[in-house]
């Protein structure tokens, strides 16, 4: 059976999603790759790996705009979220994203993991904590930030490798 041609298109604000994209590219046959990188154009490949970073519980704007254009594609979604550690949260994000995908497409896989955030985010949380009437969950948000510093890690990338099939 001949392997389908594919494209890997991603948006990466901090480098986390690019790391996932690089991992997918390592697993798949290079000869079958039509495109690898950032793009707003609809790919010619029938199979498309679409990478995103999470913004307020959904994919980034550029990725959502691209997904809305796709028709009759086999789509593998992959992404990162600074707020992570919960499969329930990841499923909620993926559910939001799928609402932007035309029903003519087929989702062939999906993967999300936590990703590190810029240090400025932690600094903002610490500053907010200095306020007398700060949000009660700031300690949890700071712990989450610290937990995210090592992600995506080797375990995250190994899980992704196992999910990617040609």
Q: Which ranges hold each PLM region?
A:
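FMN-binding flavodoxin-like domain, especially the glycine-rich phosphate-binding loop
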Residues: 3-4, 27-31, 47-51, 55-166
